[in-house]
């Protein structure tokens, strides 16, 4: 489980693709805290570190993960949001993020708004059904609040801290983002749907 509070922006050093998926090598200042077998959210997708050293870690992504997330487009040089799994002693400062990406959205508008920046992200109906204004959403692993909602999009407002500490500060029109909807909304739908 994760919180959506990014701990580091890592640098993709290599992506080795094969018939089975991809091995991704990421350099990070968190390297000393990562051991083989640890779960780490990479742009919001939960991956397992298979190797770790003083400079970073490697993780494998299956073809299904590459197809259902924006990780399939990663290349060497890309910057990725990183968050190690939540420990029992950690504070839950964001919202409950599982690292199970529900789909991919695309940035369709970027607008400066005083000291903040608003991102409008196009979402399919399978994602919008779980979105409510002032509700939680994770974009590339970042815990955010939905500021506005349309028929085909959700908009979030990024404060300077988020712009500085995550890769969303570089988000431009056309960028694909991993989207994880609020797990509480999914459980409510499931429970009420079974009763109907």
Report residues per predicted region.
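Conserved loop->alpha-helix
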Residues: 1-196
């Amino acid at each position: 489980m994760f919180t959506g509070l990014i701990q580091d922006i890592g640098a993709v050093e290599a992506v080795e693709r094969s018939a089975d998926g991809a091995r991704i090598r990421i350099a990070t200042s968190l390297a000393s805290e990562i051991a083989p077998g640890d779960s780490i959210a990479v742009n919001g997708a939960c991956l397992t570190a298979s190797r770790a050293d003083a400079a970073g870690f490697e993780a494998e992504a299956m073809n299904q993960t590459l197809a259902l997330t924006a990780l399939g487009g990663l290349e060497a040089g890309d910057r990725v949001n990183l968050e190690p799994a939540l420990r029992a002693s950690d504070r839950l400062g964001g919202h409950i993020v599982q690292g199970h990406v529900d789909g991919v959205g695309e940035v369709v508008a970027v607008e400066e708004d005083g000291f903040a920046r608003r991102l409008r992200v196009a979402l399919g109906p399978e994602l919008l059904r779980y979105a409510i204004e002032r509700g939680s959403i994770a974009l590339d692993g970042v815990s955010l609040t939905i500021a506005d909602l349309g028929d085909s999009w959700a908009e979030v407002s990024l404060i300077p801290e988020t712009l500085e500490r995550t890769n969303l500060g570089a988000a431009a029109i056309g960028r694909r983002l991993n989207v994880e909807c609020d797990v509480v909304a999914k459980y409510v739908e499931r429970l009420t749907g079974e009763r109907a």
